[in-house]
Curated annotation (Swiss-Prot):
Example GO biological process: fatty acid biosynthetic process
Gene Ontology molecular function, alphabetical: 3-oxoacyl-[acyl-carrier-protein] synthase activity; beta-ketoacyl-acyl-carrier-protein synthase III activity
Keywords, comma-separated and alphabetical: Acyltransferase, Cytoplasm, Fatty acid biosynthesis, Fatty acid metabolism, Lipid biosynthesis, Lipid metabolism, Multifunctional enzyme, Transferase
Secretion signal, residue range per the UniProt entry: none
Domain of life: Bacteria
Major subcellular location class: cytoplasm
Subcellular location: Cytoplasm
Name the record gives this protein: Beta-ketoacyl-[acyl-carrier-protein] synthase III
Native organism: Ehrlichia chaffeensis (strain ATCC CRL-10679 / Arkansas)
Enzyme class: transferase
InterPro entries cross-referenced by the UniProt entry: ACP_syn_III_C, ACP_syn_III_N, FabH, Thiolase-like
Length: 319
């Protein structure tokens, strides 16, 4: 059976860094308050002339180099983003042009913080069906442009960045994307949303969130979806080498680990240094895990994310 495997990983963070102390100069907060509640110490912010497609292309180039794959071999580009350059054309087609991937078709996927897991699942199925052999899956966000910088409940949480993986066709039984599970429930759409929209009022708007309730749902749904994918594949917690959760808040990661009795050293944590980058957070965490020597060939990892909608999902992969 055909199976897609991760051939390469790349990431990009803007040069500009905003620390908690710098935020405290403009909004009522402190480094101690932010770190205690979120674990976040800093976030990267895109320059005014930097677009989501720029960051996506930068991460994709590094992923292609890591995979030793030529741009002409890419058959599909999916960009998971909530903050595209424009309403249309898609960010993915702009990235396609920047990368000169002439043989690919490209489109965006919007599932907010779950976007990368959704995109991985879609690309995996294109490869399994034989429609493409190699795909670029990118998560890229400029969340700083949809923040109310006077709202300390949200502006301290988010950052900008991009991460990418190259997926390729692989018939090896012991590697690749083993399975994915996706969920959504629109009944919760008013708990995490933006105040704007193209049809709604013609403006991008800013993020609004019922933090306490979202926090509770995140722990519950991430925990349940991890157990679901383990059960589907007859695996136990101890069979998994790494748990790569959406990097929204270190307390969510800690509480999921505690609830499922996952040894904390198996949790990949990078939120401290880039904040919540929405669809970019999981590929950024994967890139960190690989570059730091944690993630190795044949390791089993679970990717798990939850985002506005609500949308949530998991991916079981052997590297």
């Amino acid at each position: 059976m055909k199976r897609s495997t991760i051939l390469g990983i790349g990431s990009y963070l803007p040069k500009k860094i905003v620390t908690n102390d710098e935020l405290a100069l403009t909004v009522e907060t402190s480094d101690e308050w932010i770190v205690k509640r979120t674990g976040i110490k800093q976030r990267h912010i895109a320059e005014n002339n930097e677009m989501t497609s720029d960051m996506a292309a930068n991460a994709a180039r590094l992923a292609l180099t890591d995979a030793c794959v030529h741009k002409d071999d890419i058959g599909l580009i999916i960009v998971a983003t909530t903050t595209p350059d424009r309403t249309f054309p898609s960010c993915a087609t702009i990235v396609q042009d920047k990368l000169e991937c002439k043989n690919a078709f490209a489109f965006d996927i919007q599932a907010v913080c779950s976007g990368f897991v959704y995109a991985i699942s879609i690309a995996d199925n294109f490869i399994k069906s034989g429609q493409v052999n190699t795909a670029l899956v990118i998560g890229a966000e400029i969340m700083s442009r949809i923040l109310d910088w006077q709202d300390r409940s949200t502006c301290v949480l988010f950052g900008d960045g991009a991460g990418a993986v190259v997926l390729g066709n692989n018939s090896e039984k012991d590697s690749g994307i083993i399975s994915t599970i996706l969920h959504s429930d629109g009944a919760f759409c008013d708990l995490l949303y933006t105040t704007g929209g193209t049809a709604y009022n013609g403006h991008a708007g800013t993020i609004c969130m019922n933090g306490t309730i979202v926090f509770e749902h995140a722990i519950e749904k991430l925990s349940a979806s991890i157990l679901e994918i383990l059960d589907q594949n007859d695996l136990e917690i101890n069979d998994v080498d790494w748990f790569v959760l959406h990097q929204a808040n270190i307390r969510i990661i800690e509480l999921v680990a505690r609830r499922l009795k996952i040894p904390y050293e198996k949790m990949v944590v990078s939120v401290n240094w880039h904040g919540n980058t929405s669809a970019a957070s999981i590929p950024l965490a994967l890139s960190y895990a690989k570059s730091s020597g944690k993630l190795k060939k044949h390791d089993i990892a679970i990717l798990a994310a939850i985002g506005g909608g609500f949308t949530w999902g998991t991916c079981l992969v052997r590297i």
